[in-house]
Curated annotation (Swiss-Prot):
One GO biological process term: isoleucine biosynthetic process
EC number from the UniProt entry: 4.3.1.18
Pfam families (alphabetical): PALP (PF00291)
Reactions listed under catalytic activity: D-serine = pyruvate + NH4(+)
Protein name per UniProt: Probable D-serine dehydratase
Cofactors named for this entry: pyridoxal 5'-phosphate
NCBIfam families linked: D_Ser_am_lyase, PRK02991.1
Annotated InterPro entries: D_Ser_am_lyase (IPR011780), Ser/Thr_Dehydratase (IPR050147), TrpB-like_PALP (IPR001926), TrpB-like_PALP_sf (IPR036052)
Length: 440
């Protein structure tokens, strides 16, 4: 179908495939307490408790988690040289940090928070249902040969452009499950190869991400031994991501940074289908309430959240519906249609969306590496632009005025959530750097 987007200050730039900032007109205070949402504050707390219960098993399965007692967590990195390079040195930019999920253990991306959580939760539930784990028994039993042998009769499947597939595949194989990852035509060869080395079956589809997910779902529906991790509809994925907000809150507290009405918090979250950024944003709203403002970032040709939310439609709108191509080097964000689940949750909770051009992503990737040795994928580098749009763009200044925060910006804290990069092979990363040099 063809969709005509309503009048909006960002519309023409969006349709022309140029970088811009869209401010969500439906954004409102206390939206998290809306009664008809499919998730609640209580669900975020339950997810935190689930992570704690699973931690001993995670430490047993992944040696890199021994020192953290099974916690999957990333550093909060203060911008120093990179802050100068990005032009964020003046007072109006307040505090600026990278939340380095690009260097998360186990899977090397933010998807470790969702994919690992859902697979390990499925394993626990399956074991309890089949008498392999009783009440009060040590969850580390699930890493033993008896459980692994049982799990080998089941397959965990997922549709992915790359990083979720890595996360789910790594988690499933660690427990003894078979694993199948349906990948779109946008998937990078190194991610396909890494999965196959782990013994994961990779099925590549000629079509885009949405089609890969639909194919994976159809196959799983026909086989009771296949568990499908549904990136479009999964509450488990969403809530796995949401627990990251409590980790961030603790890190800010350790640094003596207060978040309240006078000291706002801004999150800049790269977005594909929306589960990871939506989950993190929801978790942050559960903790910080109206004092946190979450912005998604999407490629100029794949702004699926932006076009759907700008349209105001109850039916999901695709980037193809407005004449965009869904072609981008940021493979983790090459998604034509956002999750309906995330759209419902974030409709009134998302502050806005900004877009980035591929050439700029490569420049930012190189800048992050040269200045602070932050190894990022192009999609992760998109987070670095957030404060620029909020402070310098006309719509960003209008947002500040509407929220009554212009005078508070020097006391604000900006979190640039870098979502992946540490697992990129050195040869591929050098190619990224060469591409950055080529575009100037």
């Amino acid at each position: 179908m063809n969709t005509i987007l309503p009048a909006d200050p960002a519309r023409d730039e969006v349709l022309a495939g140029r970088p811009t900032l869209w401010v969500n007109p439906s954004y409102r205070k206390r939206a998290i307490d809306t009664s008809d949402l499919p998730v609640s504050r209580d669900d975020v707390q339950i997810a935190r408790l689930n992570w704690q219960r699973l931690a001993p098993l995670l430490a047993e399965c992944f040696p890199e988690l021994k020192d953290s007692d099974g916690e999957i967590r990333s550093e909060l990195v203060e911008l120093k040289e990179l802050r100068e390079a990005l032009g964020y040195r003046t007072r109006e930019f307040g505090n600026v940090f990278i939340k380095a999920d690009s260097h998360l253990p186990v899977a090397g991306s933010i998807k470790a928070r969702g994919g690992v959580y859902e697979v390990f939760l499925f394993a626990e539930n399956l074991a309890r249902q089949n008498g392999l784990l009783g009440d009060g028994e040590d969850i580390r039993k699930l890493a033993a040969e008896e459980a692994r042998s049982f799990f080998s009769g089941y397959t965990v499947a997922v549709g992915s452009t790359g990083n979720l597939g890595l996360s789910v595949g790594i988690a499933a194989r660690a427990l003894g499950f078979k694993a199948t990852v349906h990948m779109s035509s946008d998937a990078k060869a190194w991610k396909v190869e890494r999965l196959r080395r782990l013994g994961v079956e990779v099925i590549q589809h000629e079509a885009d991400y949405t089609s890969a997910v639909e194919n994976a779902r159809d196959i799983a529906d026909a086989d009771p031994t296949i568990y499908f991790v549904d990136d479009e509809q999964s509450r488990h994925l969403f809530l796995g991501y949401s627990a990251a907000a409590s980790e961030l809150a603790a890190q800010l507290d350790e640094r003596g940074i207060t978040i309240d009405e006078e000291n706002p918090l801004f999150l800049y979250l790269p977005c594909g289908i929306g589960g990871a950024p939506g989950g993190v944003a929801f978790g942050a709203k559960a903790i910080f309430g109206d004092n946190v403002h979450a912005f998604f970032v999407e490629p100029v040709q794949s702004p699926c959240t932006l076009v759907h939310m700008m349209s105001g439609s109850q039916e999901l709108v695709s980037v193809y519906d407005v004449g965009l191509t869904n072609k981008t080097e940021a493979d983790g964000m090459a998604v034509a249609r956002m999750s309906a689940f995330v759209a419902k949750v974030m409709r009134e909770m998302l502050a806005g969306v900004y877009t980035a051009a591929d050439d700029d992503l490569f420049k930012l990737l190189r800048m992050a590496w040269i200045t602070q040795r932050q190894k990022l994928e192009p999609s992760a580098a998109a987070a670095l632009l957030g404060p620029h749009f909020l402070v310098h763009h006309g719509e960003g200044r209008r947002f500040q005025a509407e929220q009554g925060i212009e005078e508070k910006m020097s006391r604000a804290t900006h979190i640039l959530w870098t979502t992946g990069g540490s697992f990129v092979p050195e040869e591929q990363f050098q190619n990224f750097l060469r591409q950055a040099e080529a575009v100037g």
